[in-house]
Each structure stands twice: as structure tokens, then as C-alpha cells.
Amino acid sequence: MRKSGGKAVRYNKWGYIFLIPFIVVYVVFQLVPLITTIYNSFFENYMSGLTQVGPNFVGFENYEKLFTSGDIWQYFKNTMVLWIMCFIPQIFLSLLLGAWFSDVSLKLKGTRFFKTVIYLPNLIMASAFSLLFFTLFADGGPINNLLMQIGFISEPYKFLSHVGSTRGLIALMNCLMWFGNTTILLMAGMLGIDTSLFEAAEVGGATSTQVFFKITLPLLRPILIYVIITSLIGGLQLFDVPQILTNGTGNPVRSSMTLIMYLNKRLYSKDYGMSGALSVILFIITAILSIAVFKLSGNDDKRKE
């Protein structure tokens, strides 16, 4: 305790003590692996059969190989296509449901129940979800049997042998898994809007569509930016669903191979140097997008002030 301006200022050491477990966990599981990954990215270190090659310092050679390789650009394109296919229907569905559930004038009943149901898919493990869809859309699965019974197709459609249907299933699964979380976020933002604005618009004769596009959407901008950026970061880390659904092959013709699946293949083949370089690149992209969130949010706060 020390005196400042005639007043006693007391410092509570227990606050710092309670931070120790968090700091230890962060250093052991976050900081040390990050530094190790960056270090390994500058070395040639892989297994050739049963022979260990390296570690040999190669500088930026691993990064050069990644950027000059045609594979990484194809996998980056696959990742972005899958994210766009998932995010567009997800954001539209979430905005629609959020507007419905937050609109007091509709007087909807059972909103708590439906909010719970909407969020439930978010609690299901991706592996379970993938196995469910794999069973449903298998050659002899229920979906093919139903389509043949109603005469829509004459023979089983191989969903996982066509680029469009494989990507569509991956996007559909991710959309179903995450739209509940997005809906809750947008709904919270809508409920935080001053109701007097809606009342004034109603008195002025504005329609529901005009209110949504002129009042709700502009005031939701900070949350929408957050949702877009976090969804993009999650899209860059897409792994479990396509990995399980395609058995790690990314087929057909590697059209569903994502960057993280490519990273996993490098790690599985014990190519630690290239894996480290790819991890660093993904980390930089994620960091840039995270900074963009705070910058855009900060600009919005300044405008309000």
C-alpha cells in the first residue's frame, strides 16, 4: 500500500496470483508451440522412408516452395469456395430468423424453445455430423432410396463422386452447425437497438422492409463485421467435416482439399519444415483479419462519439 495525493492506494496481490494458471497454460500450450513452429519453418526437417533428413537450416526456402507450388493456391481456392458456399446462406438465414425472433410486434410464441432448437446443432461434434451425412447420402443410403422410390432417379446418385454435390454437402453441414450461433449473435444485436427508433419509423409510415434495411442493418454493422471476420477465420481453419466426409483425400479431384487438410497431410508425412511454414502463413492471415475486426469496430465507436 502507498499514498497518492493524500489517499491510500491498496494493491491486491491475489489478482496477480489468480492470473498465474492462465499465464502458465498460455505459455505452455500457445506461446511455446508458436515459437517452435516459427523456428521449424526455417529448417528442412522430414522423414524419407525410415531416414530422418535434417534439421538443416534453409531460410525462406520452405515459404518459397509453398508460394511457387500450384497446390497451395488450389487448396486456398477450395477453402474460400467452401466458406462462401456456407456463409452466404448462413448469414441470410440468421438475419431472417434474428429479425423474426426479435420483432416484438409479431408476438411469436415459444421463441425460447425455438432458440434452443436452433442452437442445438452447434453442440453436436463435427465427426458425428459428418458420419450422419455420410450415412444419409451413401450410395445405398436413405436419400438415394427415397429419390429412387419417388422416381426422381433410376440408379443411386454418387454424391461424393461429384464436385458440386461434395462441396454442397460440406457447405450444408457447416451451415447447419454454425447458423444457430450466428443467429444468437445477430439477435442479441437486434434486441440491443433502441426501440424508440422502430416506433418513430412506424409512426412515420415505414414498412417492415424499410425498417430492416434503413435502421436494423446499419446499426448491426459492428456485429456483422465481427460475424464475417470470425466466420472467415473459421473457414480458413475448415478441416474436420471434409476430412471425415472424404476420408482425408479431398476428392473428387482434390476439389474439397482445404489448407488445413493439406497441413495435416504434411504433418502426417512428418514434413515439419513445410508444415511450420504453412502454419505461419495461416497465423499471419488470421492475425491480419483479427486486427481488421478491432480496427473496424474502433472506427464505428469513433463515429458514434
Q: Can you annotate each of these PLM segments?
A:
Residues 8-305:
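A structural signal for multi-pass alpha-helical bundles of membrane permease subunits
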Residues 1-2:
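N-terminal Lys/Arg-rich, disordered targeting/topogenic segments
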